[in-house]
């Protein structure tokens, strides 16, 4: 069965809204800063049949988009953030209306594990590319080998022969032809939601072009050349079980250690011990003697620093694809085959964030956003009241009778309540509560029951959400992001969907409004944002961004969601210069920088 089966018979109605519908594709290579250098553009209006085919010299002389761009016109482009970045490189305005078949195809299949990943590639990650999308809908597609060959030709050359130029332009046209065919198979049940997603892709293009400013000299000239020596230093210091041979981890030594200690250990489907970093981290909570190994592998020893270095250009910015709509809840998942997103790496590395001359770098984050979304969407008056009072973890402790009103915050009780606050929205089990709290199963059962009795309206609402989703065979975010519900969909996925997909709605709305208002977003990070501002406009920019974030939260949750400034870094400082000494990763940042700069490292000899 094709992914498009069951499409509405009114799927073409949205086309009546536009006088022209231009399908557009650009081909480009990248410069040293990972920014696009547009090579050519092909476009076709499906209404009039007009076509355009422009080479780079023609594009460089353009001062306006070469196709219609009014309120009654639309641009259709697959993974449109690439085309929109090309327009930024050319100094051209953005189209008024953007429709992206990449995103709309995800909406069509999101959660339907029967069609994606393909049956013969069930371990495949990511979203369907153009050729995959065509195949999903039972449409003919070119070979992947042809696409790879053309892509390599474009990326690996700076000048093209006349024959190559003709071949590239034909390939450019083929991409447009395929997009038109795919668009005809897709059902768009809400053009307003689709245009919202297109506006977010425009925001993605702007954010990907900015990137995160870093201390390039430190990362490129000091950290990278000394990386193996840094790894060796920490391995020699912290590898108390002698599991490494130089900088290489010897799996058999850990197997032998597990058996010698008699540790209970999870196995792979083939019966081998699981040795992933996350597995060792979880096991370290059971066997504390493993904590130093877990920390060593997570923070230094197994970190492939080259994937971070690959994102940093000569201009001192780290740029990594944001991969919008990559998760089932519509969130980004920034990465690439040879790149890693700096905020996804251990916190100590973020000490190298550094604004450019005359600028400040600011991190703004929401306060208990997921709690607020669930409180607002469920209409639970007690949850809403507790959110309005401040610290939701402590307010829950008071309401649940675990702390007296007016009592000073007890960190131990607050941390226990934090487990319930964070876990209950996705259906954390008593076993999960007991494991995290290091308490008995009876205590965990009582605490879970107390949570639901404390917020009964939310409890009933979450149950109704799950029931309705299973009946409808789908669930949607406040702004229309859809997840197909099948027999395989987990109940905790449905319980958590509103908080996570609602959070994605908030992030997308903030990104759209802020970038369209001229605020420079360096990167969205889950629920937080790193923004850049001139030093003399810092206070007004923070105030404006906070206002946008608060209002976006209100539009999604129904109640204002508070915003806090997490960090302010003013040039010429880096984040590591201003973070508090007890901030996560700060001690490690200072230690590594001191090692590198004071020559306390041993050279690594590779055999």
What residues fall within each predicted segment?
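Conserved "right-hand" nucleotidyltransferase catalytic core of DNA-directed polymerases
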Residues: 1-27, 32-43, 49, 124-125, ...
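Active-site-proximal helix-loop-helix substrate-binding element of RNase H-like nuclease domains
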Residues: 32, 39-43, 49-67, 72-187, ...
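Metal-dependent catalytic core segments for phosphate chemistry
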Residues: 36-40, 370-402
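Short glycine-rich phosphate-binding loop at a beta-alpha junction
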Residues: 73-81, 365, 432, 530-532
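Cytochrome P450 catalytic domain signature, combining two hallmark sequence patches
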Residues: 94-96, 113, 265-267, 378-390, ...
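Conserved catalytic core of nucleic-acid polymerases
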Residues: 209, 260-264, 318-319, 324, ...
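Short, contiguous acidic/charged loop-to-helix segments that flank catalytic cores in large enzymes
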Residues: 306-313, 348, 363, 382-385, ...
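C-terminal structured "cap/appendage" subdomains that terminate the fold
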Residues: 518-567
């Amino acid at each position: 069965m094709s992914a498009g089966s069951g499409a509405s018979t009114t799927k073409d109605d949205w086309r009546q809204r536009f006088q022209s519908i231009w399908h557009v594709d650009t081909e480009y290579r990248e410069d040293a800063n990972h920014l696009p250098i547009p090579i050519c553009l092909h476009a076709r209006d499906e209404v009039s049949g007009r076509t355009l085919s422009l080479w780079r010299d023609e594009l460089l002389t353009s001062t306006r988009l070469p196709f219609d761009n009014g309120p009654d016109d639309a641009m259709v482009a697959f993974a449109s953030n690439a085309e929109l970045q090309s327009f930024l490189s050319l100094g051209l305005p953005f189209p008024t209306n953007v429709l992206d078949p990449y995103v709309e195809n995800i909406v069509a299949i999101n959660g339907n594990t029967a069609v994606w990943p393909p049956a013969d590639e069930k371990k495949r990650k990511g979203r369907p590319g153009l050729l995959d999308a065509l195949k999903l809908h039972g449409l003919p597609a070119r070979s992947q080998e042809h696409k790879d060959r053309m892509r390599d030709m474009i990326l690996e050359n700076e000048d093209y022969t006349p024959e190559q130029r003709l071949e590239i332009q034909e390939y450019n046209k083929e991409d447009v032809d395929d997009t038109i065919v795919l668009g005809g198979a897709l059902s768009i049940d809400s053009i307003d939601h689709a245009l919202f997603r297109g506006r977010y892709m425009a925001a993605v293009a702007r954010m990907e072009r900015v990137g995160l400013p870093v201390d390039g000299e430190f990362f490129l000239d000091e950290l990278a050349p000394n990386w193996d020596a840094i790894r060796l230093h920490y391995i020699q210091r912290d590898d108390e079980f002698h599991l490494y041979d130089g900088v290489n981890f010897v799996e058999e030594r850990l197997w032998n250690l597990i058996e010698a200690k008699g540790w209970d250990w999870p196995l792979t489907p083939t019966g081998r011990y699981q040795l992933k970093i996350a597995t060792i981290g979880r096991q370290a909570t059971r066997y504390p003697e493993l904590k130093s190994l877990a920390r060593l592998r997570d923070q230094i020893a197994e970190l492939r620093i080259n994937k971070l270095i690959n994102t940093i250009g000569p201009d001192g910015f780290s740029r990594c694809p944001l991969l919008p709509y990559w998760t089932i809840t519509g969130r980004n998942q920034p990465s690439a085959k040879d790149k890693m997103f700096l905020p996804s790496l251990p916190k100590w590395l973020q000490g190298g964030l550094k604004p450019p001359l005359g600028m400040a770098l600011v991190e703004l984050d929401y306060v208990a956003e997921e709690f607020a979304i669930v409180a607002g969407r469920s209409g639970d008056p007690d949850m809403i009241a507790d959110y309005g009072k401040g610290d939701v973890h402590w307010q829950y402790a008071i309401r649940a009778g675990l702390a007296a009103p007016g009592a000073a915050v007890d960190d131990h009780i607050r941390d226990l309540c934090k487990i319930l606050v964070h876990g209950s929205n996705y259906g954390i089990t008593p076993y999960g509560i007991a494991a995290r709290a290091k308490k008995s199963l009876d205590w965990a059962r009582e605490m879970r029951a107390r949570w639901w009795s404390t917020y009964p309206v939310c409890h009933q609402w979450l149950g109704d959400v799950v029931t309705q989703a299973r009946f409808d065979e789908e669930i949607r975010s406040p702004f229309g992001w859809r997840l197909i519900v099948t027999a395989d969909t987990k109940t905790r996925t449905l319980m958590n969907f509103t908080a996570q997909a609602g959070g994605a709605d908030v992030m997308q709305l903030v990104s759209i409004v802020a970038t369209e208002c001229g605020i420079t977003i360096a990167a969205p990070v889950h629920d937080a944002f790193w923004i850049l501002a001139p030093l003399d406009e810092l206070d007004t920019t923070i105030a404006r961004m906070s206002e946008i974030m608060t209002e976006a939260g209100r539009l999604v949750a129904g109640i204002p969601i508070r915003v806090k400034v997490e960090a302010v870094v003013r040039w010429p400082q880096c984040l590591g210069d201003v973070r508090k000494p007890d901030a996560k990763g700060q001690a490690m940042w200072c230690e590594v920088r001191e090692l590198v700069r004071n020559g306390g490292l041993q050279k690594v000899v590779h055999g």
